[in-house]
Amino acid sequence: MTTQNFLAEIGTEELPPKALKKLATAFAENVENELNQAGLSFEKVEWFAAPRRLAVKALGLATAQPSKKIEKRGPAVSAAFDADGKPTKAAEGWARGCGISVEQAERLATDKGEWLVHRAVIEGQPTKNLLVDIISRSLANLPIPKMMRWGDKTEQFVRPVHTVTLFFGGELIEGEILGVKIANVVRGHRFLGEREFTISHADEYLTALREKGSVIADFNERKALILAKSQEKATALGGVADIEEDLLDEVTSLVEFPNVLTAKFEERFLAVPAEALVYTMKGDQKYFPIYDKDGKLLPHFIFVSNINPEDPTAIIEGNEKVVRPRLTDAEFFFKTDLKQRLEDRLPRLETVLFQQQLGTLRDKTARIEALAGEIAAQIGADKAKAERAGLLSKCDLMTNMVFEFTDTQGVMGMHYARHDGEDEEVAVALNEQYMPRFAGDELPKSLVACSVALADKFDTLTGIFGIGQAPKGSADPFALRRAALGSLRIIVEKNLPLDLEDLVRKSAALFGDKLTNANVVDDVVDFMLGRFRAWYQDEGIAVDVIQAVLARRPTKPADFDARVRAVSHFRTLDSAEALAAANKRVSNILAKVEGEISTEIDRSLLVEAEEKALAEQVISLQTELAPTFANGEYQTALDRLASLRETVDSFFEKVMVNAEDANLRRNRQAILNNLRNLFLQVADISVLQ
């Protein structure tokens, strides 16, 4: 089988930097899928992406589809011909569909009779004839939320397309994609190298772009270069570069030929909280801040230029000039904010609505204050500090700094609280109330901060559900899914003895008559328990394990987690499958019983040795495991219950549960009821597959 390397490049105007990597990887995945569906073998598909191009390269791509043998069975011979031996309409219709006459059909003899059959070999198409359609479909299926048209064209794409290049080995593929004729022209860097040049082979692409066009098309190569140079520059300044993955990807998406440089700002700006300065550098300017070995911000930053002059002085000074006004603004806002205490901003919260039916931010802080105190009392935190932090929790939203730099909410509250002389735990809680901000984020460290974070999240969940505005589909304007999962993480990972029903009920009471949903407690609890499923699935825990625990609806998250871990462990035991099946059988038997099923076992009615053995073991385990269940030691309990396997198997082999004698029948049902209740103290293991 002969192969060639295949290249496809789509040359565009500047692509959205935050979406570039996602578009490029999706393009490569789509091409892979299309090649597989076409039956074309290949070694691998590589992707390339720069601000003005998306490209893929399929290595070792077969030059043609393999031939396929087909066999289409038609009607039975007895039904294919009439009494005169002429083809029936059924036979003729089948033959027509196969592109043959009935006379050309072969015969297939089977043990069920003789059938008409059409056998043929379909030659595979040359790969080059398929490539335009493969790339067109791959582009059409990219995750682009908003398309655009350009010029007088009707075609749509994320940005205007100016060049399309498709090479299969050394052959330029003819055709048109997105309204652009395929050509051997590739565009270089906008300012460096050749603006346009031609290539004659798929394997020339990367080298020609670098040498002629001054473009490093390999996204990962540019990224690695930026990272290495940034770390090198930071080390030279005696510091460490703060390089977040998302920002690094975005910067990589903004440049075609990266030139990593450093610049500085006046040391006087270091009097402003570092978070505000970093917010400006990262968010607005896409700079990498530099910290010293003690974690203090240095008056230097790293930036990446898309041009590479011999003397970079003008570029460096230009970036310093651009960032200076933003840092000056931050300095002014900070100094102005310090003139008023956080507590004195409380009245202004009355002018800002949290939600029309739920009142103002001042109303919300009053509720957070009360609920944080309740939570603190339950988890052993300082109640007064939790209430104080709850009271001040939203005051920094009224400051100039947070109004201008919104992502500094919380952290500026902490700095202003420290300036006001508030207790350190109170100050830190003002920042940590928003944790975790995203999946995998760290949790509040102190119990005071946990109290405020939970109070804030439960207030939002209860309030929004309480007015009937639960999330629908992907819409979640109040970020209730994040609030629910964040709350669960705090309670589980901090092992806090909190009950969801209790917290929602207390939260709902603080709204007075504002809530209109009478089922708000159940709705919020069910919503939060539903978040567990996604969490545990991400950890690789089987869905049936989660469902087994959900069937019992435990409302204490830490307890829920302990049950899931126990059932997940139980599922690995040799006896698990048999006991799950036995529990399913028990459930089915008991479900058919009319009226209440007793749990009283009458030893005098135990006849068979097997039922005596099971009854005694169940009664013994009930006594033995009572403290184990009470302490939430579910794995220990299930390990002991696993010892029931042989006894249960013997019982079902030898004992007729639904005996004719009513007393025997009820007594045996009572044994099974007690058996099932033992397992139900952990989960419904009959759900396990």
Curated annotation (Swiss-Prot):
HAMAP family per record: Gly_tRNA_synth_beta (MF_00255)
Top-rank taxon: Bacteria
Gene3D superfamilies in alphabetical order: Isoleucyl-tRNA Synthetase, Domain 1
InterPro entries per the UniProt record, alphabetical: DALR_anticod-bd (IPR008909), Gly-tRNA-synth_bsu (IPR015944), Gly-tRNA-synth_heterodimer (IPR006194)
Reactions performed catalytically: tRNA(Gly) + glycine + ATP = glycyl-tRNA(Gly) + AMP + diphosphate
Alphabetically ordered keywords of this record: Aminoacyl-tRNA synthetase, ATP-binding, Cytoplasm, Ligase, Nucleotide-binding, Protein biosynthesis
GO BP of this protein: arginyl-tRNA aminoacylation; glycyl-tRNA aminoacylation
A Pfam family it matches: tRNA_synt_2f
Subunit structure, as described in the record: Tetramer of two alpha and two beta subunits.
EC assignment: 6.1.1.14
Annotated localization: Cytoplasm
Protein name as it appears in the record: Glycine--tRNA ligase beta subunit
Annotated family: Belongs to the class-II aminoacyl-tRNA synthetase family.
Sequence intervals crossing the membrane: none
CC per GO annotation: cytosol
GO molecular function terms noted in the UniProt entry: arginine-tRNA ligase activity; ATP binding; glycine-tRNA ligase activity
